[in-house]
Amino acid sequence: MNTFFLSLLSGAAAGTSTDLVFFPIDTIKTRLQAKGGFFANGGYKGIYRGLGSAVVASAPGASLFFISYDYMKVKSRPYISKLYSQGSEQLIDTTTHMLSSSIGEICACLVRVPAEVVKQRTQVHSTNSSWQTLQSILRNDNKEGLRKNLYRGWSTTIMREIPFTCIQFPLYEYLKKTWAKANGQSQVEPWKGAICGSIAGGIAAATTTPLDFLKTRLMLNKTTASLGSVIIRIYREEGPAVFFSGVGPRTMWISAGGAIFLGMYETVHSLLSKSFPTAGEMRA
């Protein structure tokens, strides 16, 4: 097994397991952020509505992220080391992980954004399945074109994902490295990696909630609207506090999800690396 398939399989297992376990919390978060509030958009009814689109996209999306992330960690580090030749090891590590995770997120969003559009519209419309929502988008009822409809909220998603991942992954890698060093190890066990992922994910989730809120509102719009006009309208009509709608479920979901997502990734990666020793070469 080569390093490409190692990252692909580890990422697929991580993404699918996380979405299956935490989908109801994601639905609650989406309905809290939707215009009209939680109960107007379905309350606790049908909290697994939209699961199909999430499951279909979770494996390829997570695989794309980890393939890109693991590849960039190895390939970018020599250049970053030269760029910061007088810098500390921690600065080089942090910069490497920020760049690698950002590239990984952009690649993953090629799959994730269309799936998010379908999923979130299904979560707030009580009569539609994921397939019916997708058919509605493909019919191009608003005449804006397939690309605009499927990738609605793309720029805002990237604006959310890059700050999120620039907080989560450098912190995650730092916590793992610090814990391993304290125990005289080169790497932490998968369960320790899961704890590090939970802490890093929770902090990143809470910090980037306003960006997630804006992404949700833009994706739920049936027509294209500029980010600036959406921010101004929401601020005037609903007040500044609404930008942190869903912060509780989002932080809880991503904190616990980070433990499963990164813990599963570490577990599968470790098992496959031991079974196929040459597959572990990409780890940085």
Swiss-Prot record:
Its main location: mitochondrion. Keywords: Membrane, Mitochondrion, Mitochondrion inner membrane, Repeat, Transmembrane, Transmembrane helix, Transport. It is found in: Mitochondrion inner membrane. It comes from the Eukaryota. PANTHER family: S-ADENOSYLMETHIONINE MITOCHONDRIAL CARRIER PROTEIN. Solcar repeats lie at residues 2-75, 92-178, 192-271. The gene is PET8. Pfam families: Mito_carr. This is Putative mitochondrial carrier protein PET8. InterPro entries: Mitochondrial_sb/sol_carrier, Mt_carrier_dom_sf. PROSITE patterns: SOLCAR (PS50920). The chain crosses the membrane at residues 5-25, 50-70, 98-118, 153-169, 194-214, 252-272. One of its GO terms (molecular function) is S-adenosyl-L-methionine transmembrane transporter activity. It is a multi-pass membrane protein. Belongs to the mitochondrial carrier (TC 2.A.29) family. GO terms for cellular component: mitochondrial inner membrane; mitochondrion. One of its GO terms (biological process) is S-adenosyl-L-methionine transport. Present with 521 molecules/cell in log phase SD medium.
